[in-house]
Regions:
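RNase H-like DDE/DDD metal-dependent nuclease/strand-transfer catalytic core used by mobile genetic elements
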Residues: 1-4, 11-121, 125
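C-terminal domain-tail junction helix/linker
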Residues: 75-77, 98-186
Length: 186
């Protein structure tokens, strides 16, 4: 059994996801730290569900701050929670979860968790760098981010052009290096 952690930018639709064997507070903290290091822009607000890995339980407000909130505070990120029993307030993530499942586990059989993780990363690279969306006026998510950078560079930590994916690209994973055969949009 694996747990899918997904983050999606509400404006650009840029998606980031990881699979983990556990859904603990430490895993959520590490996921957020990796997300912050992955995206080229400054994150100012996060909306999460009320899972124990993201939020304190009722009656524990006086206890120590949870790791996820510590990272948010250190980075100047406002952490908001969805209303309980209102999953539609987090609809973009719910839709992305469905898209990921339809492109992976509902379509293919995997021999191992590593094979699934590698396919998930390949899917996300294709989704973020090659898929054109009507909501972005026909741009890919990456093209939209680059356009935003030219208009408002003060919202970015680094130039998003450094995220360009080309032929024979290798990316680091927890299990080693993953080879991506060019996902350039021609």
């Amino acid at each position: 059994r694996l747990y899918l952690f997904v983050a999606i930018d509400r404006t650009s639709k840029f998606a980031y996801a990881e699979l983990h064997p556990k859904a603990t507070r430490m895993v959520a903290r590490d996921f957020l730290s990796k997300l912050i290091n992955t995206v080229p822009y400054v994150i100012h607000t996060l909306l999460t569900d009320n899972g124990i890995q993201f939020a304190k339980r009722k009656g524990t407000e006086g206890y120590r701050e949870i790791p996820f909130d510590r990272v948010c505070r250190a980075q100047g990120i406002e952490h908001r929670l969805t209303k309980v029993c209102h999953p539609w307030t987090n609809g973009q993530v719910e839709r992305m979860n469905r898209t990921i499942k339809e492109a992976t586990v509902k379509r293919y059989h995997y021999q191992s968790h590593d094979q699934l993780k590698a396919h998930l990363q390949t899917f996300l690279m294709a989704y973020n760098f090659a898929r054109r969306l009507k909501t972005l006026k026909g741009l890919t998510l990456y093209e939209f981010i680059c356009k935003a950078w030219t208009n408002t560079p003060d919202r970015f930590k680094i130039n998003p052009l450094q995220h360009t994916v080309g032929l024979n690209t290798y990316i680091a994973t927890d299990e080693g290096w993953l080879y991506l055969a060019g996902i350039k949009d021609l």
